[in-house]
Amino acid sequence: LVSGGGKHTHHPSINAKEVYLEAGKDYAITIKYSNLYGNAEARMLWSTPEKNKLERAVNLAEDSDVTVLVLGLNERLEGEEMRIDVEGFSKGDRTALDLPLEQRELMRALVATGKPIVLVLLNGSALAINYAQEHVPSILSAGYPGQEGGNAIADVLFGDYNPAGRLPVTYYKSVDDLPDFEDYSMKGRTYRYFEGEALYPFGYGLSYTQFSYDAIKTSGRLAADNILNVQVTVTNSGDHDGDEVVQLYLKDEVASTTRPQVQLVGFKRIHLQKGETQTVEFRLDARQFSMINDQEQLVVEPGWFTLYAGGGQPNKKQTESSVSARYKVTGKPMPIAF
């Protein structure tokens, strides 16, 4: 039963129940619904229940060389104020970070076949896929890729395109890693303040090739009206052409108030043929070094800062190569206009 299809409901709900109908018999069906706003709509659909779906999936996997397993979420699970209340998902809110239960059971059953699995995830928010990380050799996060998504995913899986995506959020191992929802402080939240070990950190992503980094060089003097130039040399040291997303992070070593562990201050996507080397330049202004002090002033405090450049966050086991350099700001606190 499709309900809530009127103009005031953007997301109709589908209510289903399995019933037994004997062949050759007539059945009277009554549908009752209320019309609260006008233009209400109710439709009845039917389909034959599919039995033993899990068994069928296992049989297909056992008869295949490789299984491409597509799992994930949709707008009903992670949209706003959805009419859904199942394990891990409540009316558009996430009560856990796991995949839906049926999907987790399917993945475990397919892993048990011993056949290679490529997991493709379709999702918009973070997932705790700890089991997949341990048991699935290849995972592709595809987001919600649109009508050409199938072709794009196939290009990546068959090696016609070298992937270079980077995670825009942190993938935590569990909601237990996060502060209480009613705790509004930043402590323990996002890559900037999370001190635990993430499943996949913000900025993480793999390629079919490898990249190496040379030392960071800085030039210029940071001032309220001046720019600090930062250069880093990147080499495609692998066997394939590909894109690299060069990420530049900043750490304030000593500050008068709480500062992020690191913060992203720049990134650039570059394409390098195998064996090619390129110098990437970033231009940093004083605002990117600034903070709000105890007097609620936006300032750059004097002291040491560390710059990190690499294909991901610094000091993470998932980041293959990164380099760093220290830079000292001297003088008095530098006020910055809001």
What are the roles of these predicted feature ranges?
Residues 1-338:
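C-terminal non-catalytic regions of proteins with extracellular/luminal or membrane-system context
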